[in-house]
Amino acid sequence: MGLDSPDMRPELSQYKHLSAGKVREIYEIDEHHILMVASDRISAYDFILDTEIPDKGRVLTAMSQFFFDAIDFPNHLAGPIDDPRIPEEVLGRAMVCKKLAMMPFECVVRGYLTGSGLEEYRQTGTVCGITLPEGLVESSRLPEPIFTPATKADVGDHDINVSFDVVEERLGEARANQLRDASIAIYSRAAEIALERGVILADTKFEFGLDENGELVLGDEVLTPDSSRYWPAEGYEAGHVQPSFDKQYVRNWLTGPKSGWDKNSGVQPPALPGSVVEATRERYIEAYELISGNKFSTWIGCCV
């Protein structure tokens, strides 16, 4: 039997392990393809936590698949979610992807002011060199989405926000403009899709690469609760931190009084209590179901 038989799926151990990120493991299928496997690991404040979130890898994969299908832009997918090259043990949280020459920047788009963007704005009135109007507050909607790139850091290090000029210097004006325009266009379309479902896409991070023809291709994960901030549209009001469908719940617990942990201590964060694990899992699943309109229980490999 060949690999086209579902009974003859390869073992994960048959593939060469190329790299491990905070959440994903990358394996080589052949000269032109990789297997991208999303784990249940969760990271916060540049630490990989000791506690995993059950089903998180499947939610990330399901959300990425939904948006790769919904967004009209070339992407790195090279097979269906049940591709015979995917081992049984990782079905539902793995994708067969084209190998790309990845761009050296995280392509962040912000439609609302929060997080590190808000911190920078309060100090300088700008975000990544972009001057913003006066009087903006926590969670303010920006006049238009802004492109705020960051350098790619190694696991355990901080990504560093940079100005658009830095991207131009590194990649040239044409490629830098292409990255910015593509990022903002994809964010804008995704924000429309989410808002139709009652969800605000506050900001997100994309990664792009070049294929064998030198064409720009959307890679990695896309518009997941790991790479994006999602807020419920109902009850949204600028001026305070919004409830979220992403890992902000974990961040809030870690920096709250119950954890006993200081994010500036350099010490590994404590294990998450079961209540935080379950609440985080529920938020991830809720985000997927709300935005996609699909039931997570029908996703391949799920036992919800």
UniProtKB/Swiss-Prot annotation:
Q: Report the EC code(s) recorded for this entry.
A: 6.3.2.6
What sort of enzyme, by top EC class, is this? ligase
Q: Does the keyword ATP-binding apply?
A: yes
Give the reactions, separated by semicolons, that this protein catalyses. 5-amino-1-(5-phospho-D-ribosyl)imidazole-4-carboxylate + L-aspartate + ATP = (2S)-2-[5-amino-1-(5-phospho-beta-D-ribosyl)imidazole-4-carboxamido]succinate + ADP + phosphate + 2 H(+)
Similarity comment? Belongs to the SAICAR synthetase family.
Q: Which PANTHER family match?
A: PHOSPHORIBOSYLAMINOIMIDAZOLE-SUCCINOCARBOXAMIDE SYNTHASE
How is this protein named in the record?
Answer: Phosphoribosylaminoimidazole-succinocarboxamide synthase
Gene symbol of the encoding locus: purC
